[in-house]
Amino acid sequence: MDKFQIDKNKHRPWQQCFLYPVLFQEDLYAIAHDNDLDKSSFSEPLENFLSKEFSFLTVKRLIRRIRQQNNSIVLSGNCDPNEMINRNQNSYSELILESLAVVSEVSFSMRSKPFLEGINEWKSFRSIHCLFPFMEDKLPHTNYISDIRIPYSIHPEILVRTFRRWMRDVPSLHLLRSILHEWRDSSSTENLQKALVVSGEKTKFSLFLWNSYVYEWESILIPLLKRSSHSRSLLSGFFPDRTLFDQKIKHIVVFPHQISTKRIWLLKDPFIHYLRYEERSLLVLKGTQLQVKKCRYHLFKFWQCSFHLWAQPYRIWIHELSKNCSSFLGYFLSVKMKPLVVRAKMLDRLFINDLITNELRPIAPISSIIRFFAKERFCVISGRPISKLAWTSLTDDDILDRFDRIWRNLFHHYSGSFNQEGLYYIKYILLLSCAKTLACKHKSTIRVVREELGSELFTKSFSKKREFISSSFSKTSSQRELNWNGDILQINPLANSWQKIQNKK
């Protein structure tokens, strides 16, 4: 990175840096393999792996065979086993992909850095729950929400064309093209789609493809939204790598005073707020139904012209916030009217006014959580707790810690839900399932377990000091305030699984 920065300071085009020779540096594969070790439970020292199983000469041969583009490209699994040295061909191919991602990220990071540094209004947050206060502030003032599912079935040449804009190293582009085409033409036709969808097993190469694709998508889309919007402000937020939330406030255009108020109402475009997390995007608009349909039409045209994608209509859903709910980040989102009574006393007169405001009501899918618990054998489908037989071989501390971790993650993720009474029913299921698991392990009853452990069962597991929303139950539903927990870096796995099911509908 420092060397590339020096070349850039010498007025050399940094896009022309030769990245391909870096692929033949042995240290690069050590970095890629070390990164793979961090993500797995494999604990063998790296030097042992390099000395016993790693053959740098084999990696060079694999790269040459990939570039030849013959009928026995190594990624298809037809490589000569004699060329492998105590290591199968798939592992070497994955190592090459990881190393190619490491090299490409150097150029990609240098490209995106000036773009982010040039925007002084960007603010970064590490919690995904910074998104919910943003939505709580903006959604009540809008009336339509457009649920966008970013297309991922994209032709390899479109990706290569995207990479050519910021990577002008021809050998690296040829290698990337060969890998993408072979991936597409292999026996599994969904390989490339799996590489672009943020789901399942995430490799460095798949995340690099997805981030570069979404970066290109948003670098074109957001300026178009800014240009088409004549509102006073445009706000957008997204998560590039699942951990960063960016919010931008930019003043665009102010209408001239010569235009009358009625003409302003006819000419003014809707307020547009753009939000994204992984493959889900939300366009929140304030306008008429005709304007929202026009926005949807232009999005389809944008996909066709920029990425040659003919997306299906189900990729963009339009919901009216006052009538329908939209699922996002494991919540059901809706906007409801909230009546307020304002009393103002002036001298001897008392004025009482009734005001109606809108408020965001995020709802946790309690019934879906119970179904997931039934699938994992914590309860039956009706919600009656049962013992977790698979955990009876663990120690008491491990059992308590596991139940405590499940409750803590769920409680933190759904801390801002409007139906928090349902969370305490989830707590009851986990608490009783924990007691039944311990009773089954010791071949006793729940009463005996409670007498032996005493308060430890309820203090070590489901610690009360973590629960900061209990005071909200003393209030009425109209006075309840939403408390968002700000220390969550990614979506809860259970909520993520439920969200994927909603995406397929």
UniProtKB/Swiss-Prot annotation:
It is found in: Plastid, Chloroplast. One of its GO terms (biological process) is tRNA processing. InterPro entries: Domain_X, Maturase_MatK, Maturase_MatK_N. GO terms for cellular component: chloroplast. The keyword Lyase does not apply. Its main location: plastid. Keywords: Chloroplast, mRNA processing, Plastid, RNA-binding, tRNA processing. One of its GO terms (molecular function) is RNA binding. Belongs to the intron maturase 2 family. MatK subfamily. PANTHER family: MATURASE K (PTHR34811:SF1). Usually encoded in the trnK tRNA gene intron. Probably assists in splicing its own and other chloroplast group II introns. This is Maturase K. It comes from Sciadopitys verticillata (Japanese umbrella-pine). The lineage of its organism: Eukaryota, Viridiplantae, Streptophyta, Embryophyta, Tracheophyta.
